[in-house]
Structure formats: C-alpha cells, structure tokens
Amino acid sequence: MDDLTTIPAPVWEQAGTTNAAMRVFVGLADPTAGKPMVLYIGSLFCPYCAAARWSVVAALSRFGTFSGLSYSASSSSDVFPSTATLSFHGGRYTSQYLDFQAVELQGAELVGTQYPTLETPSDEQERLIRKYD
C-alpha cells in the first residue's frame, strides 16, 4: 500500500489535468469538525466503486493517513468480475485538513439473492446523498 499512499510530488505534477467533464461541488466546511468533508458512498460488490477507491486513497493520502484498510475485490458475478480494490469498511482516515467519511453500503458476496448490508449512512450523509446525487 506504500506505493499508493506515497506517490512523489513530481509524479502528481506529471499527471496534469484533463478536460473531463465532471460536476464539482463546493460547500462550507463541516462546522463540527472544522474541516471540509469528503463523503464516499459505495458498495464492495460494485466494480466501479472498486476502481474509484484506488484514486480516492492516493489523492487523500496527500492530506492525511489511512489505517485499517483491507484488500478486497468486487463481486465475482458482476460486470468486470473480481476487480481488485481496497475496502474502507473498518478503516480510518486522520487528517488535519479534511474530514473523510466513507460508507460501504454492501458486501461483495451474495447471501442468497442479496448483498449483505455493511454500513448505513447517517441522517446527515443521507441528506447530502439526496441533495447531490
């Protein structure tokens, strides 16, 4: 994981910027933590979430430290089966700059016909999901 969390500044600078069209939300700092919040909502079975976690960890590692992350894989029966990833479930992020909140909604392996619930968003997280999704 060190290769992911200790990317040298010159490598970041070479990556540059793109013209990708994406929505950016700018809001006020979270008054309880006194820092801007980054909210991640995903599910372990999802291969798109699996791919996104790598860049989230790499980017946020520039501003803080992750601990307790585990290696995982997306569902073996979904599109892009068994996509390698990290799991935020049970992990922690500490930073003097950002408040990172991760919610892993469901697991990666079917139990019967459903993926098991891992975590549930708080009321505030639900409000943000409804507002920005």
Predicted regions and their residues:
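Extracytoplasmic thiol/disulfide redox context detector
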Residues: 1-95
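Thiol/selenol-based redox catalytic cores and closely related redox-interacting motifs
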Residues: 71-133
